[in-house]
């Protein structure tokens, strides 16, 4: 006879995550991102990771440490899924402390791990709702363009993002301290 605990184990697909395992405590701040069933680039079983490249990563103090952080994850089942990401809390102005998570106003980074190939892909998302910026009421992703970021770069040896192994070009430019890029046309 199967116990309720065993049944629950099979019903909760998030327990199948192997690559994107969120290691943050819940802060109470969150961001909903919907991945619509119209996405054709994903395979059933792909793991989706939501990142902030400039998240608050310290906890319990006001050291304002910034870095990449995995904030939410889910497994693509072939139909719409919703992933909730964990937001940071910063009460330092009131004599409090910070908790790790995304920072409102930062760009959402979506990565996909495909177990069938063992490759982690970067992505460019198309949003049917929201802007791709943390702090939106919610976001809906209608399409994802996946690429192996280890092969991204430029085939021009004089470029700042030259990669002799690159299989496609990425256009890169700077805006203050932020490096921006897009796939070349």
Regions found by a protein language model. Name each.
Residues 1-185:
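Primarily marks secretory-pathway-exposed extracellular/lumenal segments that are disulfide-
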């Amino acid at each position: 006879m199967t116990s309720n605990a065993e049944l629950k184990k099979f019903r909760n697909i998030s327990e199948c995550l192997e690559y994107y395992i969120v290691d943050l405590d819940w802060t109470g701040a969150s961001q909903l991102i919907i991945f619509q069933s119209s996405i054709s680039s994903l395979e059933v079983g792909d793991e989706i990771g939501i990142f902030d490249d400039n998240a608050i990563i310290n906890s319990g103090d006001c050291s304002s440490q910034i870095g990449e952080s995995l904030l939410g994850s889910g497994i693509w089942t072939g139909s719409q899924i919703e992933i909730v990401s964990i937001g940071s809390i910063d009460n330092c102005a009131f004599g409090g402390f910070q908790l790790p998570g995304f920072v409102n106003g930062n760009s959402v980074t979506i990565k996909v791990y495909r177990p069938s190939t063992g490759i982690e892909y970067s992505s460019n998302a198309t949003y049917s709702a929201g802007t791709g910026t943390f702090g939106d009421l919610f976001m809906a992703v209608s399409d994802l363009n996946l690429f192996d970021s280890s092969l991204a770069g430029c085939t021009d040896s004089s470029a700042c993002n030259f990669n002799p192994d690159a299989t496609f070009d990425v256009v890169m430019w700077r805006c203050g301290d932020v490096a921006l890029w897009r796939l070349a046309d």
